[in-house]
């Protein structure tokens, strides 16, 4: 019968009547890839099915959380069992403590943890904590790194050598933006200049240690270590946003992989097993300043929700099984390297960055090491590639600047099929 999407088109038209842009998160609208979105009916293992009956190999995995694949029976069973006891209590439960203990085992830099419900909550709360314990107001973020939609973080680089931020969204006051300095990822020398200029005013530096939101960009040798030394020298806190990389580039995240301990860490995605969970944590001396043990306020009605904790704990236990990460990394490398090889064979300009169970294929012929080089990608050509792959049953993120994620449910046969389809699509693009 071939690819059909009439029901998805009708569903999108209906959604546009009640949801801004027809979606509840902008990238889902498929605007950057030149088509309307598909509407999902169900997922199982490495596959999705849409409401038109099309089946896809899924490399989005709910934007990263589903490292075991869709509807893993153990995770689903844990959610069902928890739901039968009650969906929410707004009171302490033992499973919150169990989850926190597992996180702390995996991330030794996190001596205490506070559970929240979204990555945005985690980063906003970590920044408030950093400002509270240092008594300083300014923060540094990196261009191209995304940390949720908090006002302090919806900032892009302004003009001038000392790059004070300007808002990327209406509704963000310029007074808030002026407290955020935007640096360039992998540019340690530029960061040193910023610290020389105003280091005594900087509460924290926040970054994705491996970026995932301008596509996957890896830290250059010495960058993270230099950043750790620089923040210590000036008494600023180093915050790793590992919402995406935590439990994905290794069980202990990017900090475990690169052996760099931040002061605070933000987690999300995988730790919820597909349900809304995030966390922030770090050294005890800082976390004890969080209410109610300290004066720095943070709260949430659904924080530590028992269904989400059950899903997260079940996921982490399964990830501890022998060979899980070795298998994930091998499959990811085979897909990433296979795509690179096909592109080279066809004379097609693609640059691949890969780590752990995530990678990006940038439609450019130059190395991608920062935001500027990521932006050299041909987004129109990527859009054509995306559409071709979608119609062949391969569901990729609908943006050049998002990661490809693999799960334990993906098989070698899945990867073979994906590479076959990629070859056909790239050939058709010339």
Swiss-Prot record:
GO terms for biological process: protoporphyrinogen IX biosynthetic process. It comes from the Bacteria. The modification N6-(pyridoxal phosphate)lysine is found at residue 269. SUPFAM superfamilies: PLP-dependent transferases. Its EC number is 5.4.3.8. InterPro entries: 4pyrrol_synth_GluAld_NH2Trfase (IPR004639), Aminotrans_3 (IPR005814), Aminotrans_3_PPA_site (IPR049704), PyrdxlP-dep_Trfase (IPR015424), PyrdxlP-dep_Trfase_major (IPR015421), PyrdxlP-dep_Trfase_small (IPR015422). Transmembrane segments: none annotated. Pfam families: Aminotran_3 (PF00202). Keywords: Cytoplasm, Isomerase, Porphyrin biosynthesis, Pyridoxal phosphate. Pathway: Porphyrin-containing compound metabolism; protoporphyrin-IX biosynthesis; 5-aminolevulinate from L-glutamyl-tRNA(Glu): step 2/2. Its cofactor is pyridoxal 5'-phosphate. The keyword Cytoplasm applies. GO terms for cellular component: cytoplasm. It is found in: Cytoplasm. It catalyses: (S)-4-amino-5-oxopentanoate = 5-aminolevulinate. GO terms for molecular function: glutamate-1-semialdehyde 2,1-aminomutase activity; pyridoxal phosphate binding; transaminase activity. Its main location: cytoplasm. Gene3D superfamilies: Aspartate Aminotransferase, domain 1, Type I PLP-dependent aspartate aminotransferase-like (Major domain). Homodimer. PANTHER family: GLUTAMATE-1-SEMIALDEHYDE 2,1-AMINOMUTASE (PTHR43713), GLUTAMATE-1-SEMIALDEHYDE 2,1-AMINOMUTASE 1, CHLOROPLASTIC-RELATED (PTHR43713:SF3). Belongs to the class-III pyridoxal-phosphate-dependent aminotransferase family. HemL subfamily. This is Glutamate-1-semialdehyde 2,1-aminomutase.
